[in-house]
UniProtKB/Swiss-Prot annotation:
GO process terms (BP): cell division; negative regulation of division septum assembly
Listed NCBIfam families: PRK09480.1
Complex and partners: Homodimer. Interacts with FtsZ.
Lineage: Bacteria, Pseudomonadati, Pseudomonadota, Gammaproteobacteria, Alteromonadales
Entry protein name: Nucleoid occlusion factor SlmA
GO-annotated molecular function: sequence-specific DNA binding
PANTHER family: ACREF/ENVCD OPERON REPRESSOR-RELATED (PTHR43479), ACREF_ENVCD OPERON REPRESSOR-RELATED (PTHR43479:SF11)
Matching PROSITE patterns: HTH_TETR_2 (PS50977)
Species per Swiss-Prot/TrEMBL record: Shewanella piezotolerans (strain WP3 / JCM 13877)
Compartments, as annotated in UniProt: Cytoplasm, Nucleoid
Length: 197
């Protein structure tokens, strides 16, 4: 029973951090500002997280769990190559759109001046997602008997660049230009080009 309020307080701190990242674009979040937002002292923050880096790691863990678990569902449930790619990219874009503050973490914007391991961890997450795309594209020849005329790693990188670019535009526009805007039309075009290759 004693652990339950602690978990809730940790979650509340992370929610406040994500909200501050959304409402204060371009500004660095200090522990003093975060403590004021949460309504506790800085010392109380440090009882739940030993450092600000650990708070960001908590957000990154949430991102990883949310995205990777859903990607695994897509991999299990959908067998069509193009639909898998579309759903994976759409998942990433919708997640960023629904979590504007967290999109700053995905973009790396919120991690400037923070511990290097945080940026490295986000980079690793994007590498994992790109690896899933490569796997999807490579399985096309096995599942459908057709291969692409260009290396699957190059195509996976292109698809990731599209998603990362949309997230960067979202952050740069201070969350006005939604990452999912025009995605369906853009995907239709990209898919046609991929199927012709």
């Amino acid at each position: 029973m004693a652990a339950s309020p602690k978990i809730n307080r940790r979650e509340h701190i992370l929610q406040c951090l994500a909200t501050m990242l959304e409402t204060s674009p371009g500004q660095r979040i200090t522990t003093a500002k975060l403590a004021a937002e949460v309504g506790v002292s800085e010392a109380a923050l440090y009882r739940h997280f030993p450092s600000k880096a650990r708070m960001f790691e908590g957000l990154i863990e949430f991102i990883e769990e949310s995205l990777l678990s859903r990607i695994n569902l897509i991999m299990d449930e959908e067998k069509d190559t193009m639909k898998r790619c579309q759903q994976l990219l759409q998942l990433l874009l919708v997640f960023a759109e629904r979590n504007p503050g967290i999109s700053r973490v995905l973009n790396g914007d919120a991690l400037l001046g923070e511990n290097e391991r945080l940026r490295s961890r986000i980079s690793q997450l994007f590498s994992k997602i790109e690896t899933h795309l490569k796997q999807i594209l490579r399985e096309k020849s096995l599942r459908e008997g057709q291969a692409f005329s260009i290396d699957e790693a190059v195509l996976a990188n292109l698809l990731m660049a599209i998603a990362e670019g949309r997230i960067a535009q979202f952050v740069r526009s201070e969350f006005k230009l939604k990452p999912t805007k025009h995605f369906n039309e853009q995907w239709t075009f990209v898919q046609q080009q991929l199927l012709q290759s």
